[in-house]
């Protein structure tokens, strides 16, 4: 049996195994790992927001063998994700994060229409579950207008690598009924944050949206904490911020800016 191809995860040094799909592939929910992990954390008194890769990115990054293409599996994806929505809701989950980093890629008009149709159907099945769609590694210039029209409860945007993110909000606005998860602390590098730049950005955003402070992407790209770096001098450490320190930076920013923060991050 030939191994799956391995590709870089967007512009990072992480790699992923490329899914291979043929005309006989069945796309369905298998197992209950995400739900059971949520329950385990809840039992320990830890409130979590489960996170899963979204169907648009999953199917866009796959390799296809046969006549069928991504759009031919959308209905099966809607069924599988809807089942997950139900199970998480029954377990007491309030928020689910769906990562759709493929939205920062160059998208054709056909792909944009497919994305919109996919989520119009999928979000009609969410019930009381709140859905955050999270993007990262760039801006969503090709699909921003469609994205803000969809009935997501929260939208996560990258202000670090997303060069057009701020311009998009200024040009097209941001819905008052949604929460903006603003990725203003770099989640990929190991350097300290520019507080003044972040504060200036947040002051401008505060008038157009409810804002949650966020990192630009997952913190899996950086080391855990500087506390373990005992061989570094304090002078050197002053330039660095690892995962724990970046969370502290978010807390510092929260204390420093007068905007409404409806949901702790």
Model-derived regions, located:
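Domain-level signal for soluble alpha/beta catalytic cores
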Residues: 1-265
């Amino acid at each position: 049996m030939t191994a799956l191809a391995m590709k870089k995860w967007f512009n990072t040094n992480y790699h992923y195994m490329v899914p291979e799909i043929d005309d006989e592939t069945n796309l369905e929910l298998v197992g209950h790992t995400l739900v059971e992990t949520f329950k385990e954390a809840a039992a320990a008194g830890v409130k979590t927001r489960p996170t899963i890769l979204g169907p648009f990115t999953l199917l866009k990054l796959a390799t296809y063998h046969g006549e069928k293409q991504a759009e031919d599996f959308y209905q099966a994806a809607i069924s599988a994700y809807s089942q997950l929505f139900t199970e998480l809701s029954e377990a007491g989950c309030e928020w689910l994060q769906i990562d759709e980093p493929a939205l920062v890629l160059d998208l054709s008009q056909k792909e944009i229409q497919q994305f919109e149709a996919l989520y119009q159907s999928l979000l009609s099945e969410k019930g009381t579950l709140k859905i955050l769609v999270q993007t990262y590694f760039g801006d969503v210039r090709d699909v921003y207008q469609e994205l803000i029209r969809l009935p997501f409860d929260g939208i996560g945007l990258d202000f670090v690598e997303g060069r057009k993110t701020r311009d998009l909000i200024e040009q097209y606005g941001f819905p008052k009924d949604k929460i903006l998860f603003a990725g203003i602390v770099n989640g990929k590098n190991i350097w300290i944050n520019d507080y003044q730049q972040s504060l200036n950005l947040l002051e401008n955003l505060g008038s157009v949206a409810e804002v949650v402070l966020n990192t630009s992407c997952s913190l899996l790209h950086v080391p855990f904490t500087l506390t373990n770096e005992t061989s570094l001098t304090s002078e050197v450490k002053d330039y660095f911020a690892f995962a724990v320190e970046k969370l502290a930076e978010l807390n510092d920013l929260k204390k420093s800016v007068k905007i409404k923060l409806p949901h702790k991050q």
